């Protein structure tokens, strides 16, 4: 990689992704964790390699899925000012059980997969991942409604899981910049109902983030809601989603 470490540390996450891809994001995570105690850095490295192995065949739009996991973790360190290794491990592994329970545990059950994570990374990491894992939905009920209900209930009692979810939600919203066709309206319909739920959770006094960080996240959520509304309005009116306003302000740029 030609970019020096000083330059890489100052680059927005979207620029690292576009110009340097996974190697650049891995290096940025290494920079951000360079001062962590050795045991914490080693545990984070193990979490990243497990996540990379589990999601090796997964893609997000035009990129490897691991890029998403890296950005979620880096954003928590750089922009949320969180250095708790359990929280960062959970960020790297937050989709592992939901998407790959069968690779973690022979039974394929989510509780057994979480037990494997607990044995490897500790109970707190497994608990956070569990709070961030969507259950298998009931047939016959609207999946988006069940998703919203699960997020609201699971994060209500898990302040640190809210931190990971805020970064995950911010990064997921970036998919709307690159999505085309029906994907625009599907994603907007999925995420729009979550904005007020997550905003309320982030604003709570027990959410362990600085006030200025909360304010920034809430501003991003508000702009994301405007974007989702524009996409859905255009969809119902029959306009191309590309004309539905602009991407959320600085989501995935500096932060």
Task: Specify the residue positions occupied by each region the protein language model found.
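Active-site helical microenvironments for divalent-metal-assisted chemistry
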Residues: 2-245, 250-255
